[in-house]
Each structure stands twice: as structure tokens, then as C-alpha cells.
Amino acid sequence: MAQKHPGERGLYGAHHSGGASLRTLGPSVDPEIPSFSGLRDSAGTAPNGTRCLTEHSGPKHTQHPNPAHWLDPSHGPPGGPGPPRDAEDPDQSETSSEEESGVDQELSKENETGNQKDGNSFLSIPSACNCQGTPGIPEGPYSEGGNGSSSNFCHHCTSPALGEDELEEEYDDEESLKFPSDFSRVSSGKKPPSRRQRHRFPTKEDTREGGRRDPRSPGRHRLGRKRSQADKRKGLGLWGAEELCQLGQAGFWWLIELLVLVGEYVETCGHLIYACRQLKSSDLDLFRVWMGVWTGRLGGWAQVMFQFLSQGFYCGVGLFTRFLKLLGALLLLALALFLGFLQLGWRFLVGLGDRLGWRDKATWLFSWLDSPALQRCLTLLRDSRPWQRLVRIVQWGWLELPWVKQNINRQGNAPVASGRYCQPEEEVARLLTMAGVPEDELNPFHVLGVEATASDVELKKAYRQLAVMVHPDKNHHPRAEEAFKVLRAAWDIVSNAEKRKEYEMKRMAENELSRSVNEFLSKLQDDLKEAMNTMMCSRCQGKHRRFEMDREPKSARYCAECNRLHPAEEGDFWAESSMLGLKITYFALMDGKVYDITEWAGCQRVGISPDTHRVPYHISFGSRIPGTRGRQRATPDAPPADLQDFLSRIFQVPPGQMPNGNFFAAPQPAPGAAAASKPNSTVPKGEAKPKRRKKVRRPFQR
């Protein structure tokens, strides 16, 4: 920034719209003494040779101060000197301060002369620079305090001992307590007298060796003043009152707006009610028509939207199915290519192996792996101490191997000799389940977790492993002692030769008995199945098989005349045809079930017309009472003949000695009439049946 002449620029600190301004009135004889207008200023000469300029405002104020301008922290004090500008050079500012000091001297002389002519007397306040203050002058709008008062504090007399930090802090305190001049005025209209300022006298350190102070630019430091605590409390009280006033005003306007809004809603509701009262019957018809029109429109829009969505859905489903087909085709193609590559690679490897002779080597390798020598070496390695220690380390969990962990998870409760890895708590719980078993019935091999064919070495190894896990000194389980007693009892049995031999003989006897009982029960089961599914034949004195059919008694017989199924009764015997009449099948209702007895009917040589409406024959299962004719039902107390035959075979009783020894016992024919006789079990209906002598029941032989 180029340096300007004092006559070409205004004094710093003058407001752009105020009445106090410094300007030149044209060329003068002395360039250092410019002319002034609009202010009554006074200048005095200090003992150190500097001049002080004191500015006084006019008696009338044409414009009130703007509080917003004072509250803005970006603006400096209106009447005081501001901080140095960033673009100015310190040397230039120092030169300008020297020039302005000369101007201040001239101004002070002229203002003193003018003030004496006006007849105004001012109270002078001595200062370090002998400049006379004017506390009685009304406070102007551009004073430092922001309350319209002019300052008697000369910026030339400011002690340089006040550092930049201290001055800035004082200025910040003043800025926070600035209020509009309206609050500081007295209610009577009189202007309050200005307070007497305390000036800080320079110290010895502040002066130079020649006795003069270090000239500093008045614009380099902001002017600061100290205020009393009472003024601060007063400012804070006024500031709180102003905020409370603004808050009350805002609440009042909010209440007014709320009342207006409620009134508008009430007015709208009244108009609506009044409009509803003036409705006519024709309006309802018009409303119905209007609703119908809009319903039709909405229905049309819904139909269009539904069609659009359905078409989109169908298109999406079609695209998705096509995509799935394409994906499946690509996967099949990739699978085919992969299999083709595998086949080609395998053929290439086989051909390469044939050329290099790898096939013979592979055959030799597999044969060597299957050789007895290698198996013997593996067995010796498995029985060696290093291998056993390694297995023990793995069992205790000191060496965690992934394949061993999988083996543990898979085997679970496998025997210890086959590689079972269990926790001590699991072993204690397993042994406690056998604590209530008597010692005579205890299975020592099951307790030790080994097979019954285990050797003495395997038994001792299993006992040691379990003893380490369940011993009360090693395991802190509350019932570890009971588990160890069970283990000790099992070890006493297998460790003593006599006890072990006795246990093995007892086990062999139990096994033999159980085997014989199992054989008997299996044979009995087979005989019962055979007895339940066979029928006695009086012609061949044998048995024929019968097959249970999946038919209900209510719909058992097929009738060709009615083309439907008829119900059947107990003992009914009928025939049905199949395969265009080429195959005849015989059925009977016995024990509430329908059976296929074609084999028995073929042996009896029974001829029955198939698919008839009436039942042609009836089977009798019990003895007839003399003097009765017609159908005979089996008595519920009479046992079946096949079960009697089965019992007779068990107790070795001939069938002829038992009553009702067969199903259909034929009567004893007379001599010479054997050829003409027929089995009485298949006597046609309506014919007289020969009477049979009642047999005496005999008890079973025991």
C-alpha cells in the first residue's frame, strides 16, 4: 500500500457517516498543518515534544448509534483507534504516526483558541503528557465505550508496558459489555457525567535512554479501558432484561399466530357445516353419479394396472424360465467338457505310463504295500513305546491333529483299545451307571471298554488308562471313588486266573442257554406263522397255504350279474374268474378276514361256478350237534384245528386222538361206498348231510 500524505487522507477512526471527520480544505502553506471542520478539537503539547488531539462531539446528535454495529465482533470500537492493517508496512505506519503527531500539535492549539471564544469551560485532567481532558463534554456517538461519551484517554500517553495480549483482553471485555445508548440514558433526560479515567503512568522501562518514550503507531494496538465490577454487573443485568423482553415479545407473537390459526380452522368447519345443511336430494343424486363415474374410472385404472402387472409377471416368468434353461444347458455343456477333459487326460496318462513303464512300477508298489513284511513292520511300530507315547500325548490333548480330532468326534463311545478318546468326566459317568450292578453279574470287559477276546496286555493298558482318569487323587469328581471301585472290581476279575476262568464258564453257559432259547423261540415263531397261514386238508392229510387278501367283509364277493361287490359272512366259500375266465380263484371268509385258498380247493377238487350272485358253499369249522341241519357255525370255545395240530406236535399226541383234529373231517364211509363219497366240507346247499357220531373229549397227555 503506497504511503499517503496526511493532507490527502482522513484521520483513522473517523466514521463514514458521522459529523466528526478530518479532511483537507485545499493547499496550505505548511503541508503538515491541515484544516478541520465539523468537530471542535483541541491539541496540546506534551513534555516529551508530542502533541495530543482531543476530539469533542457537537451539541446536537443527528443520528442515533446502531447497537447491531457495536455488537458485531468484526467491527472495532467506533471512536477508538483500530488494529493495524495487514497490508501496511510497520515502517510506513511509524512514519505516518510521526507525521500525525505534528498534525495533532497544530490541531490542539487551534481548538483551544476556539473553545475559549465560545465561552465553554472544561475541567482539565492532568496527564503524563500534559494534555487536558474534557470530561464535561457530552458523550459522542463515536466514543470508545459506545455510550456517546468522548474519551480523555490519549493514545499517545498509552504506556507501552501494556502488551498486545493485555490490551486485546481488555478490549474483548469491553466488547462483551457494550449495549445500546438507550439503556444507559437516565430517565430524566439528563446526560450522565463521564467517569474519571485512571491513566497508567509510564515506568522506567518504558522510556528510552534519552528520556523519550518509544513512539508507537496509535493504530497498532486497540485502545483498552478498565471498567469496574459494578459497571459489568449493570451491563449484564441490562443484557438479561433485553433478552427477557425479546423472549416475551416472541412468545406473544406466537400466541397471536396460534389464535389466528385456530380461528381459521373454526371458520372452515363452520362453512362446511353450513354447506352440508344446504344440501338437497338432487345433490345426493349428483353425488351418487359422481361417485359412480369415479368408481368406474378407478375400476378401469385398476384393470389396466392389473393387466400391466400380469403381463409383466408372465414376461418375467418366461424370461426366468428361459434363463434357467440356458443356465442348465451351460452347466451340462461344462460338465460334458469337464468329463471329456478328464477322459482325455486319463488316456494320456495311461499311454504315458505304458511308454515309461509306470504301470509295472505301480503294480509292484501296491503289491509291496500289501505284503506281510510291511504289515509286520507296521504292527511292530504300533506296539513300540515311541508310538504309544505319541498316542498318549494325542489322547491327553497336548498335540492337536485335525484327523485325530475328527476320529474322536466319529468314534464317540468306541472301546479304548480301538482308539477311544474320552474325557475323565465322561468315564466317571459311564462307570457310575454300573455301580448298582452286583459283582457276580458285572461284565469286566465292558467296564474296561475292551472286547471279550482282548489279551492281557490290552487289558492292563486299558486299566491303567482308566485308573489315571478316574482315580480320586487325579479326578476331583465327588463320586470318583465309587467309579474307581467299579473299575477295581472288574480288574480283580480279569487279573485273577481262577476268577476269570469261572466268569468265562458262566458266560459260556449263559450264552448256550440264551442261544437255545433263541432257537426255540425262532422255531416257535416260524411254526406259529405256518399255523396261521396254512389249512389242514382231509384228502391228502397235509396242509395247504392260504394268503390274506386286502378286502373288507362288507365288500368281499364280486357278482357278475350286479357288477358290484357283495358282503360276505363267516365261512362263506366262493370263486371268482379273471383273465377272460381262464383263471379261477377261490376265496373264503375266515376269522373276519378274506383268504385266497385256491391251493386247498384244487386239492379238494371242488367245482364252483365263478362270479355268482349267491354263495354256493359254506365251510364249517366246528362239530355238529345231532339233529341239526343247515349251516353250522363254529363255537367260539372250540379251538382251531391247525392250532390243535400244532399243540399235538409239540406234545407228540396223534391228531386222531384229539377232537376236531382237522378242519374238514370226512365221515367214515361204508365199505364199497368210498368212491361215491364226497367230502362233507363241500356239501351243496339244500342237500341232507349225514349225521356224525359225537366224540368224547380226552385230556392232553402230560
UniProtKB/Swiss-Prot annotation:
Listed GO biological process terms:
protein transport
Bias (Pro residues) ranges: 75-84
Tissues in which the UniProt entry reports expression: Highly expressed in pancreas and selectively expressed in brain, lung, liver, skeletal muscle and kidney.
Q: What is its main location?
A: endoplasmic reticulum
Compositionally biased residues, Low complexity:
659-676
- List the biased-composition ranges (Basic residues): 192-201, 218-227, 690-702
Transmembrane ranges, per UniProt, are 250-270, 300-320, 326-346
Q: Where in the cell is it found?
A: Endoplasmic reticulum membrane
Q: Region entry Disordered: which residue ranges?
A: 1-148, 165-229, 658-702
Tell me the GO molecular function terms. dopamine receptor binding
Task: Return the Basic and acidic residues bias intervals.
Answer: 202-217
Q: What keywords sit in the KW lines?
A: Chaperone, Endoplasmic reticulum, Membrane, Protein transport, Transmembrane, Transmembrane helix, Transport
Q: Which GO terms describe its cellular component?
A: endoplasmic reticulum membrane; membrane
Output compositional bias ranges, type Polar residues.
113-133
Give a yes or no for keyword Protein transport in this entry.
yes
The record's section on Pfam families has: DnaJ (PF00226), Jiv90 (PF14901)
Q: According to its record, how does it sit in the membrane? A: Multi-pass membrane protein
Record-annotated disulphide pairs:
none
Ranges where the J domain occurs: 443-507
Q: What segments bear the compositional bias annotation Acidic residues?
A: 88-103, 165-175
Annotated function: Regulates the export of target proteins, such as DRD1, from the endoplasmic reticulum to the cell surface.
Subunit structure and binding partners: Interacts with the FxxxFxxxF motif of DRD1 via its C-terminal domain.
Protein name as annotated: DnaJ homolog subfamily C member 14
Its gene name is: DNAJC14
